[in-house]
Amino acid sequence: MHRIPGPIRVVLTGGIACGKTVVSDDFRALGTEVVDTDIISRELSKPGSPMLEAIAKALGAGALSEDGSLNRRAVREMAFHDKGKLGILNAITHPAIMEEAMRQAFAARGHYVIMAVPLYFEGGAGGYADRVLVADCAPEVQLARLMARDGSSEATARAMIASQASRDTRLAGADDIIDTGSLSFDEIRTAVLNLHQKYQTL
């Protein structure tokens, strides 16, 4: 397969509450451009947008908050409990989000660009990554972080984790790994700096 042109694309992914934001923020601090699909998703689903209208039509009025914005918690609950709705949601959002992500990646000026794609493996691990960086942590650390962050019960947190690709799948598909569970913030920063220097030579 021919490589898609443009800067080197490093996909940053990882399980929920595994420290992807900390890692991406450290890359940003080094001047690296970061294309974040979560941010793109929020931009594309603003009130009045075609994507938001399509989501509301497919999932019903419960997908919207009183102010007309996307009710992310409600949509997450719908998708979590109904695989059919999850498939519909992904069919509406994924192509548009990835089209914009690739547009931003092509426009990046550095030697490499970080593409933060939380559900990279769940989305079929499309052939746009030159390298895959996984933010990882031990399952017990992930569970504790998720419960603390979202105020979730243990059962809900475990179910959310189980709905994603397995840790083994992510690690098997990784070219590089940063263990955010065992490293301090300073050590994570150092690990990012080392990878930054490595990626500059690819």
Regions of interest found by a model, annotated:
Residues 1-70, 190-193, 197-202:
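Glycine-rich phosphate-binding loop of ATP-dependent small-molecule kinases
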Residues 15, 58, 78, 92, ...:
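Amphipathic alpha-helical segments that mediate coupling or scaffolding at interfaces
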